[in-house]
């Protein structure tokens, strides 16, 4: 497998133990997501990747948590999704399109 090229990175704020997985808008420049899983043993991180993979129609293997494995503020890298595509898909999801 060839090395992954420079990824697009995004800063997120995660709210674990929510009722359901959903985008919750922006807070202080960070995209905020609610995740239903508990923040224990990596469950919320796995569910975050699963949710974003479905939402953004991107393979799970192409999304990686770079920083913040044990905190609410995270940096994610997307290896096959451009910043423009990410922003368009997030905007559409936030506005119900």
Swiss-Prot record:
InterPro entries on file: DUF167, YggU-like_sf
Pfam families reported in the protein's UniProt record: DUF167 (PF02594)
SUPFAM superfamilies reported for this sequence: YggU-like
GO CC annotations on file: cytoplasm
Homology family: Belongs to the UPF0235 family.
Protein's UniProt name: UPF0235 protein DehaBAV1_1103
The organism of origin for this protein: Dehalococcoides mccartyi (strain ATCC BAA-2100 / JCM 16839 / KCTC 5957 / BAV1)
Lineage: Bacteria, Bacillati, Chloroflexota, Dehalococcoidia, Dehalococcoidales
């Amino acid at each position: 497998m060839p090395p992954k090229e420079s990824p697009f990175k995004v800063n997120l704020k995660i709210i674990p133990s929510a009722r359901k997985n959903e985008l919750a808008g922006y807070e202080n420049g960070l995209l905020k997501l609610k995740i239903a899983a508990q923040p224990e043993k990596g469950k919320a991180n796995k569910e975050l990747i699963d949710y974003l993979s479905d939402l953004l129609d991107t393979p799970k293997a192409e999304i990686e948590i770079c920083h913040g494995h044990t905190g609410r503020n995270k940096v994610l890298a997307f290896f096959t999704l451009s910043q423009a595509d990410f922003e368009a898909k997030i905007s559409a999801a936030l506005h119900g399109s």
